Amino acid sequence: MVFEGFLTGEGLRVAIVAARFNELITSKLVGGANDAFRRHGVAADAVDTAWVPGAFEIPLVAEKLAKSGNYDAVITLGAVIRGATSHYDYVCNEVAKGVAGASRETGVPIIFGVLTTDSIEQAVERAGTKAGNKGYEAAVSAIEMANLLRTI
């Protein structure tokens, strides 16, 4: 037997958790995600967005939304840009672990769409210029995973 998730969003309820820190970038990611949801048939009123202060706060809110039972999938969006200290490494590792753990614990797909880049230029590229929009990609993954889990 082959299990596959289809890219149709009709009937899905989804949540976006987005970090306000680096909002110049994250607002573009959220826009890309909403565009993907719309293009794949997710109703506009079936998409809720929670803004958190920074990337470190994403896992807690994503887990709470997933546990609510109101959503078929949650996507997480943020931009962590390397600086002169080791803060970047701690934040990236903890956010990634937190999101993965919350998804496993709740059984709800929580998609990691947090950019981890070495420069602001790389982040801008991934938020809708040269390298596409990672928010859009995260939304498409959420649709596919929500549908896949319905078939298993």
Curated annotation (Swiss-Prot):
Active site as annotated: H87
Catalytic activity: (2S)-2-hydroxy-3-oxobutyl phosphate + 5-amino-6-(D-ribitylamino)uracil = 6,7-dimethyl-8-(1-D-ribityl)lumazine + phosphate + 2 H2O + H(+)
Pfam annotation, one family: DMRL_synthase
Cited InterPro entries: LS (IPR034964), LS/RS (IPR002180), LS/RS_sf (IPR036467)
EC id: 2.5.1.78
Chain sites annotated for binding 5-amino-6-(D-ribitylamino)uracil: F21, A55, F56, E57, A79, V80, I81, F112
A GO term, aspect molecular function: 6,7-dimethyl-8-ribityllumazine synthase activity
Annotated pathway: Cofactor biosynthesis; riboflavin biosynthesis; riboflavin from 2-hydroxy-3-oxobutyl phosphate and 5-amino-6-(D-ribitylamino)uracil: step 1/2
Record carries keyword Transferase: yes
One Gene Ontology term, aspect cellular component: cytosol
Free-text function comment from the UniProt entry: Catalyzes the formation of 6,7-dimethyl-8-ribityllumazine by condensation of 5-amino-6-(D-ribitylamino)uracil with 3,4-dihydroxy-2-butanone 4-phosphate. This is the penultimate step in the biosynthesis of riboflavin.
Annotated NCBIfam families: lumazine-synth (TIGR00114), PRK00061.1-4 (NF000812)
Quaternary assembly: Forms an icosahedral capsid composed of 60 subunits, arranged as a dodecamer of pentamers.
Protein family membership: Belongs to the DMRL synthase family.
Protein name: 6,7-dimethyl-8-ribityllumazine synthase
